[in-house]
Amino acid sequence: MTLLDPLANALSHITNSERVGKREIYIKPASKLIGEVLRVMQKYGYIGEFEFIDDGRAGVYRVQLLGRINKAGAIKPRFPVKATEYEKWEKRFLPAFEFGILIVSTSQGVMSHKEARDRGIGGRLIAYVY
């Protein structure tokens, strides 16, 4: 069976593991995009430490959970967003103003919508976390 969206699978695995109270999980297969999303989540305090483990195949991420995630999910389709439109998408995907983050893929890398808005750059929405 083929895995169609590894990012959506990883985020649902994180959400489900948080709900049952796990403290450490393994996400496979690993990818650069999943690693960048984990980095943004760690920067905002949603997860603890994470590390890449090379298993000779696609690799695995070991992630420490802190119990701070209510919901995390991938945004499909990957909507293009201008630098001035972030508020509209916040209202659509986040439960309250300034609560949670949208993760955006920009020409300057993967970052949160807050960081992208401060830099004045647009991109494509790839995930949300709150």
From Swiss-Prot:
Record's keyword terms, sorted: Ribonucleoprotein, Ribosomal protein, RNA-binding, rRNA-binding
Nucleotide-binding recorded as keyword: no
Pfam families attached to this UniProt entry: Ribosomal_S8 (PF00410)
Molecular functions per Gene Ontology: rRNA binding; structural constituent of ribosome
GO biological process terms on file: translation
GO CC annotations on file: ribonucleoprotein complex; ribosome
RNA-binding among keywords: yes
Record NCBIfam families: PRK04034.1 (NF003115)
Quaternary context: Part of the 30S ribosomal subunit.
Function text: One of the primary rRNA binding proteins, it binds directly to 16S rRNA central domain where it helps coordinate assembly of the platform of the 30S subunit.
Record-stated family: Belongs to the universal ribosomal protein uS8 family.
Name by which UniProt lists this protein: Small ribosomal subunit protein uS8
Native organism: Pyrococcus horikoshii (strain ATCC 700860 / DSM 12428 / JCM 9974 / NBRC 100139 / OT-3)
